Each structure stands twice: as C-alpha cells, then as structure tokens.
Amino acid sequence: MKILLTNDDGVHSPGLAALIKKVSEVAEVVVVAPDREQSAVSHALTLHHPLRAARIRANVFSVEGTPTDCVNLGIHSLLSYRPDLVISGVNRGANIADDVTYSGTVAAALEATLMGIPAIAVSLVTRSAGEHFEAAAACAAKLAVTVHQKGLPRDTYLNVNVPDLPAESLLPPLITCQGKRSYEGTIVDKVDPRGRNYYWIGTTDLSFEDIPGTDYHAVSRGHVSISPLHIDLTNHASIETLKSWELP
C-alpha cells in the first residue's frame, strides 16, 4: 500500500510527524505538505503565482501552497505513481460540525476524493498544543488498512476526530454524522498605535449542539468519531419543495 500524507499545520508539525511514524508501519509513505501553517484555508487553490516545492528529506516535500495545492502537486507531478490512499493530518484541533467547511485538513481529503483516490482526514480534538498525536495517528493507520481492504463508497471520504487522550483511554470508534456548531459571531475590534482599526475573528469559545449520533456527541464522551462526508452538497430533500415555488 502506498499512501500520500499531507496536512494544513505545516510540514514540520508534530501531528504530521506522528502520522509519518505510525502510517509508515503499514504502508510506503510520501509526504507533500505546506511549508507553513495553512489552517482554515478550506479548499483554496493557488492560481495567481507559481507553486514551489522542495525535497527536505527522503520522500518528504515542502510546498509553498495550500493543502489542496499539495494534493494536486503530489499526485500530478511529484509522485511517480498514483497513491492508494491520501491521509491528511493529524490536525491540531477538532474538525467537527460546521467547522469542516473551513478546514484545510478536510479539504485535502476532499481534493483526493475528487481525483478518485480514497482519503481520510484526521484531527486531534484539543484546544491546546495537543499531547496525544501518536494515539490519533495510530487510529488513522489502522483505519487506512481497513479502507484499503474494503474501499469507500463512491465520492465519499472519512473525517476522523480523536479525543486528546492516551490510546488506552480512547473509547471505541463510532460512525457519526456532521454536527452543528452554535455561532456567536464575535469580532474583536482594536485600534493600533497609528489610530487604524484592526480586527480578530474566531476568538470566541467554540460551542456545539450536543445531538446524539453526531461527531461532537461522540468525541465529547471520549469516542473516536468517523464521519463519512460526500462530495455532493445538494440538499436532495428540498428539491421537490423548491420545484413547487413560482420562480421568477
């Protein structure tokens, strides 16, 4: 099995180091990851300047670009073969509920899925530096073997969130659906020494609806959450209702 690894925390992040260590035990690994942190860039592509890549050691490439750039460049240029699987992570911080739409980690898995390659995004549920990246990476390695053996449904990729706990304390994985975040929309408005306004977003504490069966419900109780995500964003249940509208 040959696996391409990437992330959005950067090529030197502890989560990626843990993933390299654990996944290398079950597969041949090549890393193509951003040269710096690219958190919350979602599915962005670099289109207005050239990408640059550097081999920093054997089978590890650093790219001046986004996670989606890394998947594209890895599969279409840097690798001499088509990987069996792409794993993105281990992200420092949860990627659950509506936050998956912002995530560069999840978007890298989406990009691989668009190319027809099975993919897994894996994140460590922590609001600090994170301690148990290796436990999360071990979960990803085990799941990689299962996915390689069984395959994934068409246009589907897996979003895995692992509580920041020692491996022996983790509860069994649960298959979950995407949860719902409660948004407060607080903006921090400041004035710099030259009298100009500047702003910080994303500074409030995160809160989520505690709904059984969701990713948040699982990880908040110590379970590993595995959510199958789909490329098709259509709300199929609403189509017939919208067809009944008198459209202009």
From Swiss-Prot:
It holds the Pfam family SurE. Nucleotidase that shows phosphatase activity on nucleoside 5'-monophosphates. The gene is surE. Its EC number is 3.1.3.5. Keywords: Cytoplasm, Hydrolase, Metal-binding, Nucleotide-binding. Belongs to the SurE nucleotidase family. Binds 1 divalent metal cation per subunit. One of its GO terms (cellular component) is cytoplasm. Gene3D superfamilies: Survival protein SurE-like phosphatase/nucleotidase. It is found in: Cytoplasm. It catalyses: a ribonucleoside 5'-phosphate + H2O = a ribonucleoside + phosphate. Its cofactor is a divalent metal cation. PANTHER family: 5'-NUCLEOTIDASE SURE, 5'_3'-NUCLEOTIDASE SURE. A divalent metal cation binds at D8, D9, S39, N91. This is 5'-nucleotidase SurE. GO terms for molecular function: 3'-nucleotidase activity; 5'-nucleotidase activity; exopolyphosphatase activity; metal ion binding; nucleotide binding. The keyword NAD does not apply. The keyword Transmembrane helix does not apply. It comes from the Bacteria.
